[in-house]
């Protein structure tokens, strides 16, 4: 019994550790500072951080002599980035409660902090892994981002996607919930929340075979979503096609975790309906090109959906599906978003203020202002001159602590 507890339950302890207060001071001087996507940039500005919070920002900030200075020659500073769609499902994350800090720090840097991510949303993983990572990060034994997790995603009855069956260990498939009734879905969601989940992920449309999508019964999706909303949690959906998107809309989903990639029937009226309901979308454009096909006949209709959603002033969140997609570089996502008509300010909004607002923490993070949490990204170049500069990160600072530096 002791071994079973150690393996299955001990990693789930303390699922929401308190974020420790930051200590010390640092400054970034003579930088171009984008305090938010909508404010004018500060040229030759300084950001001063004390005890994990922004102390001051502006062109005339005095830096005391005892403050650590981050070297920054003509660099650019923004608020810390969010990746609103990640997964900790690669085998290298297994047994995260016990792996060495050095190994996990290297993996976190490679996948996340070297890309500027100070906050990430895990859209479905083994909670024993994700909760262990979060606990070790928040107790300062690891250098990593803040983690929101959906815990175990919910699938339609007999609706595990074919690509997960082909890639995940067989024993994990056993634990992937496929509720047959609305009542069962609610019980699973309540259990998820008790184990530390911060949001709900529904596969409202699941590719059970290549080219065939199985929609989730609307009653199951709706009751599960209602359960999450009663706890103040957001609901994500993997929609896949028209039917899956309609289930997402009708069941009260808040965020599409992908643009629907089977685009037939996903027209302007449907997109407008999503925007009217204040749904957000995470495009994950590179993922489609990397894991499905680079055929323009497949990709261009997806890009057209994103263009239309953006033109109708729908809220877009940045996310890459990294962890499922094992190419961690973010450059291609930025290029693809630019192809959809987004400029640097639009993309900065996706990376910062939009997710902070959607998750209800805009008063704490998402922009650079005195009193806010010192989550910062230092870039080598200006994304207003080159959109891929968002991918060239020099330093990542979370809660006033340098968690990545070149």
Which ranges hold each PLM region?
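Histidine-rich, glycine-flanked metal-binding segment
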Residues: 13-14, 18, 24, 33, ...
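C-terminal cap of metal-dependent C-N hydrolases
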Residues: 31, 351-353, 357, 370-406
């Amino acid at each position: 019994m002791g071994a079973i507890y150690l393996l299955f339950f001990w990693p789930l302890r303390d699922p929401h550790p308190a974020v420790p207060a930051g200590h010390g001071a640092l400054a970034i001087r003579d930088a171009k500072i984008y305090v938010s996507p909508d404010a004018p940039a500060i040229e030759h500005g300084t950001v001063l951080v004390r005890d994990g919070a922004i102390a001051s920002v502006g062109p005339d900030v005095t830096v005391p002599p005892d403050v650590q200075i981050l070297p920054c020659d003509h660099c650019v500073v923004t608020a810390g980035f969010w990746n609103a769609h990640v997964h900790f499902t690669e085998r290298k994350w297994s047994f995260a409660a016990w792996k060495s800090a050095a190994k996990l720090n290297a993996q976190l840097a490679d996948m996340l902090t070297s890309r500027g991510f100070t906050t990430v949303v895990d859209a479905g993983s083994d909670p024993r892994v994700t909760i262990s990572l979060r606990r070790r990060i928040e107790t300062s034994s690891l250098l990593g981002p803040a983690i929101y997790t959906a815990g175990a995603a919910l699938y339609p009855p007999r609706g595990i996607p074919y690509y997960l069956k082909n890639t995940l260990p067989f024993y994990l498939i056993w634990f992937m919930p496929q509720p047959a009734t609305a009542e069962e879905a609610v019980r699973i969601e309540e259990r998820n929340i008790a184990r530390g989940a911060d949001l709900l992920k529904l596969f409202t449309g699941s590719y059970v075979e290549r080219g065939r999508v199985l929609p989730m019964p609307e009653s199951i999706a709706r009751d599960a979503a209602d359960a999450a909303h009663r706890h103040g949690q957001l609901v994500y959906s993997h929609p896949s096609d028209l039917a899956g998107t309609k289930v997402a809309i009708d069941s009260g989903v808040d965020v599409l975790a992908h643009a629907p990639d089977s685009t037939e029937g996903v027209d302007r009226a449907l997109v407008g309906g999503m925007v009217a309901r204040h749904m957000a979308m995470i495009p994950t454009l590179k993922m489609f090109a990397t894991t499905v096909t680079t055929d323009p006949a497949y990709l261009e209709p997806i890009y057209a959906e994103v263009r239309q959603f953006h033109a109708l002033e729908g809220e877009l969140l940045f996310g890459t599906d990294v962890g499922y997609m094992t190419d961690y570089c973010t450059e291609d996502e930025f290029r693809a978003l630019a192809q959809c008509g987004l400029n640097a300010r639009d993309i900065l909004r996706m990376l910062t203020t939009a997710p902070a607002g959607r998750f209800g923490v805009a008063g704490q993070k998402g922009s650079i202002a005195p009193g806010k949490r010192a989550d910062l990204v230092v870039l080598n170049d200006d994304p207003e001159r080159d959109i891929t500069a968002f991918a060239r990160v020099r330093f990542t600072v979370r809660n006033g602590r340098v968690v990545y530096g070149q």
